[in-house]
From Swiss-Prot:
The keyword Repressor does not apply. This is Ubiquitin-like protein ATG12. Ubiquitin-like protein involved in cytoplasm to vacuole transport (Cvt), autophagy vesicles formation, mitophagy, and nucleophagy. Conjugation with ATG5 through a ubiquitin-like conjugating system involving also ATG7 as an E1-like activating enzyme and ATG10 as an E2-like conjugating enzyme, is essential for its function. The ATG12-ATG5 conjugate functions as an E3-like enzyme which is required for lipidation of ATG8 and ATG8 association to the vesicle membranes. It is found in: Preautophagosomal structure membrane. SUPFAM superfamilies: Ubiquitin-like. PANTHER family: AUTOPHAGY PROTEIN 12, UBIQUITIN-LIKE PROTEIN ATG12. The gene is ATG12. It is a peripheral membrane protein. It comes from Cryptococcus neoformans var. neoformans serotype D (strain JEC21 / ATCC MYA-565). Keywords: Autophagy, Isopeptide bond, Membrane, Protein transport, Transport, Ubl conjugation pathway. Its main location: membrane. Belongs to the ATG12 family.
């Protein structure tokens, strides 16, 4: 009987890292995403979320993008998604507001 290797996205529970549900919400004149809910690995840095968001919005490197957690503060790019969720998660989501102009602070 032949065995097959599971796909990379189907790791065993011992190997799998927890996922965090991230909900993106636009602010001001920023483009609205058609699908705004995604899962991110808890161990990823917030910088990975920013890069993913830029890709989803089709932004160039020189385009401005400001991100906020719960419309309150701008997280550091080296914060982990998991720590942000543990501290600021709302109703099972990490809410990330985004704008192409500075909205707060």
């Amino acid at each position: 009987m032949a065995t097959t290797t599971p796909p990379l996205d189907r790791l065993s529970p011992a190997q799998a890292q927890p996922a965090v549900v991230v909900r993106f919400k636009s602010i001001g004149s920023a483009p609205i995403m058609k699908n705004n809910v995604f899962k991110a690995t808890a161990g990823h840095k917030f910088q990975a979320v920013i890069m993913f968001l830029r890709q989803q919005l089709g932004m160039k490197k020189e385009d401005s993008l400001f991100t906020y957690i719960n419309a309150a503060f701008a997280p550091a790019p080296d914060d982990t998604v998991g720590s942000l969720y543990k501290s600021f998660g709302t109703e099972g989501h990490l809410i990330v507001n985004y704008s192409n102009t500075q909205a707060w602070g």
